[in-house]
Amino acid sequence: MAWAQWYEKTTDVDGFRFQEAEAIPAWFVKDFIEATSDVPAAAKKKGTDEAPEYVHKDIFAVGDFWHWNTEYLNGYIKATDNETSMFDVPLHFNFHDASVADGEYNMADLLKGSLMMNNPEKAVTFVDNHESQVGGVLESYVEDWFKPLAYAVILLREQGYPCLYIGDYAGIPQVKVKSKKTILNKLLKLRKKYAYGTQHDYFDHSEVVGWTREGDEEHKDSGLAVVMSDGMGGTKRMYVGRQFAGAHFADVMGNAKYDIKIDDEGCGEFYVNRRGLSVWIKKDCKL
């Protein structure tokens, strides 16, 4: 693995992506990451037996293993001695299936079978990529109407390491994919300022699901409630924390035109419109 150490020392990169990881032996990935994590700080002095000093660096690695079964993905991760993460392909397929089901998808199963839920510390979550996009070699495109919902899942939950697709952010004119920059910027700001604290899941309905984050003391006014629907929409009673009792929350996505009051138990009746996404934070808080 001398070449791997040379490459790391020359480029000083801090991570690697292994394309088609299913064709790369797990032992190779393990040895490669271990080699690039400890790079000689200086060459061995000529004519001496003095060993070179090594500098340790935390190298991030992710494998692109296009398989819907988390058992295969976790097996590969384990075989690398947990040196690599994996793209959450099962979650992507859930997004795709929900987006093309015309309201017939069971939203309670949206996270079922995903790395996000099964091995969150090793899950690199994504919505689409260069292979799943329209015209891609593994086309399984997540329809545009569902993109806000899918990105809310990977950006506003505590599990997973989210990855944004440049094709969604900037658009792909060649295949008539419009930019989602405005809504993605809003979700990124929500992640940075408000998506903190204990999480409570409400994936208990076929059409309307959601979760809340209670916030923490380190991030002023943090905490939020997310509710989404692939059907006619509706309301969902969710617990956001007793510390918010009496506070008014507003939907920063602009889909609900009214604010709600959190009750004495720390719960609110959070609304979402048809095939929509609503993200509720304390009223008058800014992005």
Describe the role of every protein-language-model region:
Residues 2-287:
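Active-site-proximal helices and loops of the catalytic beta/alpha 8
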